[in-house]
């Protein structure tokens, strides 16, 4: 007979609050949101106005402010002007990512002109380059052929970026839902987006490259540039499967991914296998950047934009840091938070961005 059983039981009762407190101390709370330095590594502030950035100081957020070639050459020029001006005004809060135009693609010197343009943006402080889904999904050459990201004409540009150590943020392809009918899509935000943007709903365009062809073109480009620091925007368009994301990150050791506009797909998976998603985030904690894909137009009121951004930021913080059950707009059913340890959250929200964009956010 174990005469120490009452003593052991008593010790367990006394220790259990201490164990619980220790677990809580290893995780951030909702109150910690305003105490922890954070980077939104996928943001679009299309304005020279500093007010939004000043409002976000209370949230302890800094930004990678990204230019996108989505509206023509004139808009691209204006976006560069505002993005670089905002960086110059608040280099301690805003890092800049530039982009390039495909205008003049069929000319013999497109690559040289593009490199000169990008170098000019780097001289003004840009630390990364964004490539967008118009490559592979929209832009065609003079013969009417879609230009994929592994086209040889891009080779000198990517080789230059690789040599200079410039990060490339790539939104290539779309979420896998894009190739499914609306009723089969897994999350509401994809369903709503492709209902409004039928031109990108590839299920309706069977003559266009498949999802697999888009991913393969991206991977061939990375194989040609093994030392390129590539950040796969939107979970590298592999948002539907942590297994596939893991394979991608294992295959390309210089690649990272951001969470922008795809946390709903992560929640869809954690709703079905929470522990698997937690294990993925633990294993690849050094390769994941928090981002939202939030966009603020030049004519938007900073206070209104900040209120919308904070709502998103707080919801994501709750998901990653607590084990509370919550309603999210991307899903019809509630999802339980992941309650990640502080060490993992600090990397996803801050340390990885500081490491990947060296020299950023300094006065």
Label for each model-derived stretch:
Residues 22-93, 112-113:
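An N-terminally biased module of ancient metal coordination in phosphate/nucleic-acid-related enzymes
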Residues 39-43, 63-66, 94-98, 129-131, ...:
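Hydrophobic faces of well-ordered beta-strands that scaffold small-molecule active sites
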Residues 1-9:
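Bacterial N-terminal signal peptides that target proteins for export
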Residues 42-50, 69-79, 103-112, 139, ...:
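Acidic-and-aromatic substrate-binding clefts and catalytic sites of carbohydrate-active enzymes
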Residues 23, 206, 210-220, 225-363:
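H/E-rich (His + Asp/Glu) clusters that bind or coordinate divalent metals
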């Amino acid at each position: 007979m174990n005469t120490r059983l009452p003593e052991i039981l008593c010790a367990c009762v006394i220790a259990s609050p201490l164990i619980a407190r220790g677990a809580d101390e290893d995780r951030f709370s909702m109150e910690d949101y305003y105490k922890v330095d954070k980077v939104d590594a996928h943001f679009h502030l299309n304005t020279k106005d500093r007010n939004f950035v000043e409002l976000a100081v209370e949230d302890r957020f800094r930004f990678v402010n990204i230019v996108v070639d989505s509206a023509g050459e004139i808009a691209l020029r204006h976006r560069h002007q505002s993005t670089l001006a905002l960086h110059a005004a608040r280099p301690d809060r805003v890092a800049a990512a530039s982009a390039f135009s495909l205008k003049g693609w069929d000319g013999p010197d497109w690559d040289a002109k593009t490199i000169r343009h990008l170098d000019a943006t780097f001289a003004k402080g840009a630390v990364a380059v964004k490539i967008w889904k118009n490559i592979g999904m929209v832009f065609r050459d003079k013969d009417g052929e879609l230009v994929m990201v592994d086209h040889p004409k891009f080779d000198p540009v990517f080789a230059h970026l690789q040599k200079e150590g410039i990060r490339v943020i790539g939104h290539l392809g779309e979420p896998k839902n894009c190739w499914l009918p609306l009723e089969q899509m897994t999350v509401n935000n994809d369903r709503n987006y492709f209902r409004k943007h039928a031109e990108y709903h590839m299920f309706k365009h069977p003559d266009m490259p498949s999802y697999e062809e888009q991913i393969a073109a991206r991977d061939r480009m990375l194989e040609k540039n093994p030392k390129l620091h590539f950040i796969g925007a939107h979970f590298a368009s592999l948002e539907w499967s942590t297994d596939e994301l893991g394979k991608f990150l294992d295959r390309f050791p210089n690649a990272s991914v951001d969470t922008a506009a795809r946390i709903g797909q992560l929640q869809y998976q954690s709703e079905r296998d929470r522990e698997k998603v937690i294990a993925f985030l633990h294993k690849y904690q050094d390769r994941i950047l928090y981002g939202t894909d939030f966009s603020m137009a030049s004519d938007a009121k900073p206070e209104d934009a900040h209120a919308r951004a904070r709502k998103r930021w707080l919801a994501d913080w709750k998901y990653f840091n607590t084990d509370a059950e919550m309603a999210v707009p991307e899903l019809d059913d509630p999802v339980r938070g992941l309650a990640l340890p502080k060490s993992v959250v600090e990397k996803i929200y801050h340390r990885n961005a500081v490491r990947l964009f060296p020299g950023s956010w300094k006065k």
